[in-house]
Amino acid sequence: MKRRQLMRYAGAGLLTTMGTVIASEFSPSLAQKPSGGLSVQWLGHTCFLFSGNGLRILVNPFRPIGCTAGYRPPKVAADLVLISSQLLDEGEIEGLPGDPQILYEPGAYKVSGIQLQGISIAHDREGGRRFGNNVAWLWNQGGIKILHLGGAAAPIDLEQKILIGRPDLVLIPVGGGSKAYNPEEAKQAVSALNPKMVIPTHYRTQAADASNCEIVAVDEFLTLMDGMTVRRANSNAIALKSSDLPENGSVVQLLSYNF
């Protein structure tokens, strides 16, 4: 079932790029409402669960291996699953509970009143020739404009910057390696996007298999962001409202993982 859903939505993504809007397959009761409030839960690596407006969106479920070896499998209930690629550290959809809809192709989508944009960004520093393209996801939920960059490795170009605008919340890879931004590249992307809040992702933690993980810890990124406020949560989840975000400048938010 998961494979059929994934393939169906792959085709739909190509259609919506040409201007066709997907009809929602979710219950009308899940439609986005004007009232705000968003829960952001970190499930390890680049995997997050976003809950707001009665909708649960899971991004980048993974298989525990390599840099994610010590994390628990993120098998959580969701209404919609977004994946940045079909690599095991950000696109493992087998075994997810329930029957969520799955999107993985770039394009414009409308699901239960929420408009989502999948934006293609190279997954390596070779124009995608090694690892193909990564899909960054842009949407509004709970009154928050969210950009999840997945495993982006190429700079944000002018066309992408115009399409994205200024996000409220950016989730950005910072640990480097061959498939995603290193700390300096992440800093440049943050500068280009000027988000209100930055949540670093894709960095080395104690979950890593030391013999099979090439990414670095988050501290290197934080050092480069000298002068920017850093908040550290004592849990893996935060609740956000638009009023919590700075009007000027950016703040870095770190979440904790309970190993």
Predicted region positions:
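Conserved acidic residues
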Residues: 77-79, 168, 196
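C-terminal segment of N-terminal export signals and the immediately downstream linker at the start
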Residues: 22-51
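Active-site-proximal beta-strand elements of phosphoester/diester hydrolases
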Residues: 39-42, 56-62, 115-122, 138, ...
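Active-site-proximal loop/helix segments of hydrolase catalytic cores
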Residues: 125-193
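Pre-active-site segment of Zn-dependent metallo-hydrolases
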Residues: 47-106, 117-134, 152-163
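Binuclear metal-ion centers of metallo-dependent hydrolases, dominated by the metallo-beta-lactamase
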Residues: 115, 131, 197-259
